[in-house]
Amino acid sequence: MRASYLFTSESVSEGHPDKVCDRISDEIVDLFYREGPKAGIDPWQIRAACETLATTNKVVIAGETRGPKSVTNEQIEGVVRAAIKDIGYEQEGFHWKTCDIEILLHPQSADIAQGVDALQPGEVKEEGAGDQGIMFGYATNETPDLMPAPIFYAHKILRLISEARHSGREKVLGPDSKSQVTVQYENGKPVGVREIVVSHQHLVPDLTSSQVRDIVEPYVREALPKDWITPKTIWHINPTGKFYIGGPDGDAGLTGRKIIVDTYGGAAPHGGGAFSGKDPTKVDRSAAYAARYVAKNIVAAGLADRCTLQLAYAIGVARPLSIYIDTHGTGKVPEEQLEKAAAQAMDLTPRGIRSHLDLNRPIYARTSAYGHFGRTPDNEGGFSWEKTDLVEQLKRAL
């Protein structure tokens, strides 16, 4: 391991155009999970794959669903407008009341459904994966939430500013923003911040970069460890000088374009599949959650300081094709033993993951901004993959 290096990660706010689309897609997934039980539909039978495009005063929603027929386009439109309103868009080029919404949802392909729903030989009551693919999970003990420091603090900066904006304390700030944090590492441990970037939309046209810095700097300092900012830290606040036109009016958004922001900020591999808009039969989402869950519990158990875990699946096949663990030289037991322990401690079939993490619930809109990982599990079942309740099972399996 290098003695000294810099590593950078970025985050974006819930008002970033791509995150607006992630939020809308996940709100629709949640809608189907809320309405399904009301119509007598087993949550295990709900399916949703929803993609969103947002641009100037226009939202287009396309994809495949299976669920209650009681979910109408009017109901979906209402959910979309409520999401945009909650994010805070009331500007001329993108307003929750007046933007045009086009809905192009249709039933899930029968060819895909037969692979997911069909019983597999020798695997009674098991459902196959919704697609092939590889998924990664990662954990490190360099922050309390067992996340890499650069992405952890990049998220925290924007989350604090967003809370201030929503509370009404910072009325001149708009919904769209980005952050980037360059962290200095010594002997593999984060010790300070070399560079800070914050680009934040403002609602007053002639607000200067200096004035925006006066607004956001206290939140940046609150987010970071006290001694990490020094006189040598370089600040870049609205470096282009002006950020008045923001959101989908300034830059078109799409679901699934912020997969590194959603995960580990580039500190770990990514299998390439996005999360938002997908029900948990899609292993792009559910298996990535499971991989994080197992990796986090390995680190929480003290079995490694860092852990990368890869899972692989084939469409229509229930069992994972492979489980791979790399502890980056920090493991307390051989990685081959950890791989066996992971398989014993948790059922990593799609059904096993959905059951263990209780994923057949309307818990997805809350994941659509500020990362799917490093979050606090809530009372409604959200972020269940962040629990550390697998520690004892892993230890017993070794």
Curated annotation (Swiss-Prot):
Its cofactor is Mg(2+); K(+). GO terms for molecular function: ATP binding; magnesium ion binding; methionine adenosyltransferase activity. Residues 108-118 are annotated as: Flexible loop. It catalyses: L-methionine + ATP + H2O = S-adenosyl-L-methionine + phosphate + diphosphate. ATP binds at H16, D176, S177, K178, K242, F243, D251, R257, K258, A274, K278. L-methionine binds at E64, Q108, D251, K282. K(+) binds at E51. GO terms for biological process: one-carbon metabolic process; S-adenosylmethionine biosynthetic process. Binds 2 divalent ions per subunit. Binds 1 potassium ion per subunit. The keyword Disulfide bond does not apply. Pfam families: S-AdoMet_synt_C, S-AdoMet_synt_M, S-AdoMet_synt_N. Mg(2+) binds at D18. The keyword Metal-binding applies. Pathway: Amino-acid biosynthesis; S-adenosyl-L-methionine biosynthesis; S-adenosyl-L-methionine from L-methionine: step 1/1. Its main location: cytoplasm. It is found in: Cytoplasm. GO terms for cellular component: cytosol. Its EC number is 2.5.1.6. InterPro entries: ADOMET_SYNTHASE_CS, S-AdoMet_synt_C, S-AdoMet_synt_central, S-AdoMet_synt_N, S-AdoMet_synthetase, S-AdoMet_synthetase_sfam. Keywords: ATP-binding, Cytoplasm, Magnesium, Metal-binding, Nucleotide-binding, One-carbon metabolism, Potassium, Transferase. Catalyzes the formation of S-adenosylmethionine (AdoMet) from methionine and ATP. The overall synthetic reaction is composed of two sequential steps, AdoMet formation and the subsequent tripolyphosphate hydrolysis which occurs prior to release of AdoMet from the enzyme. Belongs to the AdoMet synthase family. This is S-adenosylmethionine synthase. It comes from Bradyrhizobium diazoefficiens (strain JCM 10833 / BCRC 13528 / IAM 13628 / NBRC 14792 / USDA 110).
